[in-house]
From Swiss-Prot:
GO terms for cellular component: endoplasmic reticulum membrane. It comes from Dictyostelium discoideum. Residues 1-52, 95-186 are annotated as: Disordered. Keywords: Acyltransferase, Endoplasmic reticulum, Glycerol metabolism, Lipid biosynthesis, Lipid metabolism, Membrane, Transferase, Transmembrane, Transmembrane helix. It is an enzyme of class 2 (transferase). Catalyzes the terminal and only committed step in triacylglycerol synthesis by using diacylglycerol and fatty acyl CoA as substrates. Pathway: Lipid metabolism; glycerolipid metabolism. It catalyses: an acyl-CoA + a 1,2-diacyl-sn-glycerol = a triacyl-sn-glycerol + CoA; all-trans-retinol + an acyl-CoA = an all-trans-retinyl ester + CoA; 2-(9Z-octadecenoyl)-glycerol + (9Z)-octadecenoyl-CoA = 1,2-di-(9Z-octadecenoyl)-sn-glycerol + CoA; 1,2-di-(9Z-octadecenoyl)-sn-glycerol + (9Z)-octadecenoyl-CoA = 1,2,3-tri-(9Z-octadecenoyl)-glycerol + CoA. This is Diacylglycerol O-acyltransferase 1. It is a multi-pass membrane protein. The keyword RNA-binding does not apply.
Length: 617
């Protein structure tokens, strides 16, 4: 009877194991599914963390403009965001792909003290929807940031452990110090307060002096001298506006307008490509190839149309500016949607909240696509800051001001610049250095007026008009480039939409892939030089590469003058001299080349005679 219980026990064990045998493959399948979900979540977490740090890196690059030394009255203390700097190191560092994603922190190395720090992992959707502006007014940080943080931490615990007697002693010591150290100025002041140690107001030692009165005087002198030249020019030449230069060569075709309307084909193509990719109608490689073809065609096809139909140069320049603008928008549109599709592979948000257009792929509509093509920015995002309403009075004032100043620019070009450049053809052909220098200096004043007015009309008036109509909230289209003491600050601040596009679409991806800062800067200038050359050479049908090499040479000038002129007034003077004298020389060279290659444009235009020599009163 003793062997019976073991036999019964074996039967029971066998009976217990029998229902578990068919569950073995099911459990393995569940484990495999769980592993695939974990791997997928791990990859998504890594992409979300990379996207979060990418945004911090871009924000840190933009806020460098607030701390740059290449301007007048540059900040003496460098304000920095330590979190963004450490995030930037994490963004640029090579990470291990086999990270354990069960933890909520990812190791990074702080650029301040070289120690390992932890960055809390956040959801990218929270950052996009509730993004707070970075505050630059943080406490000043010296080079030894770790020492400051350690001292502050030690001081915090020290205050908690102090007793009341120590606090009283510290307060008494502080009061004694305040009483025993009066202001130095009061020690040197006489009894009646009439005399003290102080410099002259015009001395360099004087602080806080205002020279606004002198600025008003210089403005009055400038207006008076300019108005005198206007009267003198009218007495000698009369009204010399030539409307033949602005007429449309083929009224039945309107080549400039037709080429501009052609851009809509590429905008719709970009929308259809992203829509097909979101619905997975085409493979990823096919969508990637279609994006490249569309981005290249938006530049090549309209440029070839300008060469074929030959509109007048004024119309051609406007069309080429539109082509470059919309090509940059289409590239940014494809880049951001491709990135969002990787962050949302199953498009689950589309099912959860189909009405929210600030999440992918709900943003893929023809209306939102054209809204982005109209707003004054080149960087595509899922959401933008919006103004509450359209200010009709503000909009009307800006429109009237833009039309008035545009007519003023048209009058100045015809009345002053064209006669001067026409009179400069003969000295340029004879290579008469003295007359060439005289023409450049004579052309510098009207050219500077036209350039400044053109900047004000486009970047301040036109972009604000478009922003007001579309209720686009961010109106920082430029910064104080006129205070530049170096060319680096000028090129980063005079055209902020292009600067944003370069940082987001060129500089940041190159830095992410391990390229150096100088290589990123070089590629930004290279792309900018290509666009400048297209705007100039295509309308004038002349590929001389002067604009290309002129932009690329800026890198050499920046490298030579960056450390010498930072924050110095002399640097700002040299900057303005290069603007005042450099631009007229470029205008003369391109005009001479265009007249020699296209004499039919001015066949019926008589060159103006030189004015009689008159004494300067």
């Amino acid at each position: 009877m003793e062997p019976i219980p073991p036999s019964n026990g074996n039967k029971n064990n066998s009976m217990d194991k029998q229902p578990q045998q068919p569950q073995q493959p099911q459990q393995q399948q569940q484990q495999q599914q769980q592993q695939r979900r974990d791997q997928r979540n791990s990859k998504l977490n890594e992409l979300n963390e990379t996207e979060r740090v990418r945004n911090r890196f871009i924000s840190h690059e933009f806020h460098k403009l607030d701390r740059t030394k290449s301007r007048i009255d540059a900040p003496k203390i460098s304000f920095s965001d330590s979190e963004s700097e450490s995030d930037s190191e994490f963004f640029l560092a090579k990470r291990n792909t086999n990270n354990n994603n069960q933890n909520n922190t990812s190791p990074t190395f702080s650029s301040a003290n070289g120690k390992q720090s932890n960055l809390t992992q956040r959801k990218i959707n929270t950052q996009i929807q509730s993004k707070q502006p970075t505050n630059n007014n943080v406490q000043p940080l010296t080079d030894d940031e770790g020492t400051i943080n350690h001292s502050n931490h030690h001081h915090h615990h020290h205050n908690q452990n102090n007793n009341g007697n120590n606090n009283n002693n510290n307060n008494n010591n502080n009061n004694n110090n305040k009483i025993s150290t009066p202001p130095k100025q009061e020690e040197k002041m006489t009894m009646n307060g009439l005399f003290t140690l102080r410099p002259s107001i015009l001395s360099s030692e004087s602080n806080g002096s205002s020279y606004r009165g002198f600025l008003n005087l210089l403005l009055i002198l400038l207006i008076t001298a300019s108005f005198r030249l206007v009267i003198l020019n009218h007495l000698l030449y009369g009204i010399r506006i030539n409307l033949d230069l602005y007429k449309i060569s083929e009224y039945h075709r309107w080549p400039g307008v037709m080429i501009s309307l052609m851009i809509n084909l590429f905008i719709i193509a970009a929308y259809l490509i992203e829509k097909a990719a979101a619905k997975q109608l085409l493979p990823d490689r096919i969508c990637y190839l279609l994006r490249i073809i569309n981005c290249a065609a938006v530049i090549i096809v309209p440029s070839g149309s300008i060469i074929a139909f030959s509109p007048n140069p004024a119309s051609g320049i406007i069309v080429m500016i539109l082509i470059c603008t919309f090509s940059m928008k289409i590239i940014s549109y494809a880049y951001e949607n491709s990135k969002q599709r990787k962050l949302n592979p199953d498009n689950k948000k589309f099912v959860i909240d189909p009405t929210n257009t600030s999440i992918y792929p709900n943003n893929l509509s023809l209306r939102s696509t054209y809204w982005f093509m109209l707003v004054p920015t080149l960087v595509y995002q899922l959401s933008y800051p919006r103004s509450p309403k359209i200010r009709k009075g503000y909009l009307l004032r800006r429109i009237v001001e833009a039309l008035s100043l545009s007519l003023l620019i048209l009058w100045m070009v015809n009345q002053y610049m064209l006669p001067l450049v026409q009179n400069s053809i003969e000295p340029l052909e004879k290579i008469d250095i003295v007359l060439i220098v005289e023409r450049i200096m004579k052309l510098s004043l009207p050219n500077l007026y036209v350039w400044l007015l053109g900047f004000y009309v486009f970047f301040h008036l036109y972009l604000n008009i478009v922003a007001e109509i579309t209720r686009f909230g961010d109106r920082e289209f430029y910064r104080d480039w006129w205070n530049s003491t170096g060319l680096d600050y000028f090129w980063r601040t005079w055209n902020m939409p292009v600067h944003h596009w370069m940082v987001v679409l060129i500089y940041t991806p190159m830095r992410r892939r391990g390229f150096s800062k100088n290589m990123g800067y070089f590629m930004c200038f290279f792309v900018s030089a290509i666009f400048h050359e297209l705007v100039i050479s295509i309308p004038f049908h002349s590929l001389k590469l002067w604009g290309f090499f002129g932009i690329m040479s800026q890198m050499v000038l920046i490298a030579l003058t960056k450390n010498l002129m930072n924050g110095r007034n002399l640097g700002n003077v040299i900057f303005w001299i290069s603007i005042v004298l450099g631009q007229p020389l470029v205008v003369l060279l391109y005009y001479r080349n265009f007249v020699l290659e296209n004499p039919e444009w001015y066949r019926n235009v008589e060159p103006p005679t030189s004015p009689p020599v008159m004494p300067f009163y």
